[in-house]
From Swiss-Prot:
Domain ATP-grasp: 97-287
Pfam family, one: RS_preATP-grasp-like
Superkingdom as given in the UniProt entry: Bacteria
InterPro entries: ATP-grasp, ATP-grasp_carboxylate-amine, ATP_grasp_subdomain_1, PreATP-grasp_dom_sf, PurK, PurK_C, PurT/PurK_preATP-grasp, Rudment_hybrid_motif
Keywords: ATP-binding, Ligase, Nucleotide-binding, Purine biosynthesis
Family matches, as PANTHER family: PHOSPHORIBOSYLAMINOIMIDAZOLE CARBOXYLASE, PURINE BIOSYNTHESIS PROTEIN 6/7, PUR6/7
Gene that encodes it: purK
Annotated ATP binding sites: 93, 133, 138-144, 175-178, 183, 206, 257-258
UniProt lineage: Bacteria, Pseudomonadati, Pseudomonadota, Gammaproteobacteria, Vibrionales
GO (cellular component) term, any one: cytosol
Protein name: N5-carboxyaminoimidazole ribonucleotide synthase
Keyword ATP-binding: yes
EC number per UniProt: 6.3.4.18
Pathway in which the depicted protein is active: Purine metabolism; IMP biosynthesis via de novo pathway; 5-amino-1-(5-phospho-D-ribosyl)imidazole-4-carboxylate from 5-amino-1-(5-phospho-D-ribosyl)imidazole (N5-CAIR route): step 1/2
Amino acid sequence: MHVLVLGAGQLARMMSLAGAPLNIQISAYDVTTGDVVHPLTLHLLGHGLEQAIEHVDVITAEFEHIPHDILAICQASGKFLPSSEAIKAGGDRRLEKTLLDHAGVRNANYYVIETREDFNKAIEHVGIPMVLKSALGGYDGRGQWRLKDAAQIETLWQEMAACIAATPTQAIVAEEFVPFQREVSLIGARGKEGQIEVYPLAENIHVNGVLSLSTAIDSPDLQEQAKHMFTAVAETLNYVGVLALEFFDVDGQLLVNEIAPRVHNSGHWTQQGAETCQFENHLRAVCGLPLGSTKLVRETSMINILGEDTLPASVMAMDGCHIHWYGKEKRAGRKMGHINVCGDYSGELQRRLCALANVLDEKAFPAVHEFAKKWQA
């Protein structure tokens, strides 16, 4: 099988690594340049989408912010999975909210803002405090504001109005502020025949809006809620592939915060922690192969490497530590790679995270240090 991935970043790279043992070949299409490249070496393989489509069996995507003309071409080929509808919903908060409502899953109360009058209505409908998010283009904490009191209204409106004016069809989605205890996510896969497999929930810690630490957890009640909502969304979309749902945990009740119609950062732990990783299961699904087991095989955490292109040699020497570099040029705050940390028995994972805190810079890895302080207290 030959799969074309829309996007030439680290997710396409890791799909390529997962596909090789299954004899699944991956090419990556750079939606900005129009180049078709090898996802590991970035060696140029060709140019132009239509020609690339002719030579592959399946088309999929590694991110949701894809120009609609490209999506239309891929959808018309009959080879694109999950679907242009799913990708669009992941890239537009208005469509995402409509999808969640249609699927009947809990999400924060919201109101769509396009004008100053809409902002006034949103304040009445949603209330203060509220979180405001750009409908298009926002990710990793970008394009977001928080309205805490009425004194901020005019200042925030000026910023939001500029955001709306800068991009055609842009809007702001106002959401009620949710006083959650923690953020969790569920990664799952749905096959062509409708079979569904989900991984254990992961608890996620964000720093400045960017995922820093993700740990697989055992929470049967939350797992059941999450799987029910995952199934509702996946079946509403007739989804094929890996899908991620991010949740707020509010006193033991889950609310969907976001969906991602693709393999996801909070699922990278599955590379070492699950029977079948998310990248392999995505390829299995879109290629019409049986889904692999999502069973947890060892306790695992994933640590994002942000803005760093080297690590102390002692990290590689530590038992249970697996480093995954993305081959990117160093840039402040950029996702450069991740570390999967595993433990085979209770407490071993936690002790290894504490050991990592002793050698990793606190400024670059704040969540690991915060975890260590709490664990050792």
